[in-house]
């Protein structure tokens, strides 16, 4: 599941740290 910046949902089950890391890699 791809979340949009500023709209990340803590219920997604994935740590926000990894989500932000993907944005940076990204």
Curated annotation (Swiss-Prot):
List residues modified as 4-hydroxyproline.
5, 10, 15
Q: Per the record, where are the segments of Acidic residues compositional bias?
A: 1-12
Expression sites (tissue/organ): Expressed by the venom duct.
- Which cell locations does it reside in? Secreted
In which domain of life is the source organism classified? Eukaryota
The terms describing its cellular component in GO are:
extracellular region
Region (Disordered), start-end ranges:
1-26
* UniProt keyword list: Gamma-carboxyglutamic acid, Hydroxylation, Secreted
Q: Which sequence positions carry the modification called 4-carboxyglutamate?
A: 4, 8, 14, 18, 20, 25
Q: What else is known?
A: The mature peptide does not contain cysteine residues.
Q: What is this protein called?
A: Conotoxin reg6(gamma)
